[in-house]
């Protein structure tokens, strides 16, 4: 199942100018997906807005919680299940 994650943080907690914080937060998120059984479909950042967008494929919300745990202290995340738009259109239109 696909999930779209939006993580936001403040300028004060931003890891952009702190390489150690970057490794300890999003570095661990990006490198830990496979070990947790989560497929990282893609990740994008809007640095000026302090927002990270991640799409994952997994069968468990608990795996998403474990994946995001390194970034919990610097901000918050919203997780939404999503579907492939082309597949939905095909299903609806036959």
Predicted regions mapped to residue ranges:
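Short S/T/G/P-rich N-terminal loop/turn motif that feeds into the first structured element of a domain
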Residues: 1-35, 39-41, 45-50, 62, ...
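Short hydrophobic/aromatic beta-strand micro-patches
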Residues: 8, 55-57
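A short local loop/turn or secondary-structure capping micro-motif enriched for an aromatic residue
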Residues: 13-14, 73-75
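Juxtamembrane helix-loop transition sites at the ends of transmembrane segments
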Residues: 27, 58, 78-81
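Short active-site oxyanion
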Residues: 51-53, 76
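Conserved catalytic core of Hanks-type protein kinase domains
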Residues: 57-58, 70
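Short amphipathic alpha-helices in soluble, non-transmembrane regions
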Residues: 64-72
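Conserved short beta-strand edge segments in small beta-sheet-based binding/regulatory domains
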Residues: 74-86
């Amino acid at each position: 199942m696909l999930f779209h994650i939006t993580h936001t943080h403040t300028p004060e907690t931003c890891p952009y100018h702190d390489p150690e914080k970057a490794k300890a937060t999003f570095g661990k998120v990006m490198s830990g997906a496979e070990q947790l059984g989560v497929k990282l479909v893609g990740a994008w950042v809007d640095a000026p807005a302090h927002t990270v967008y991640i799409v994952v494929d997994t069968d468990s919300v608990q795996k998403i919680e474990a994946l995001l745990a390194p970034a919990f202290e610097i901000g918050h995340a919203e997780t939404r299940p999503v579907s492939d738009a082309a597949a939905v259109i095909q299903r609806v239109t036959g």
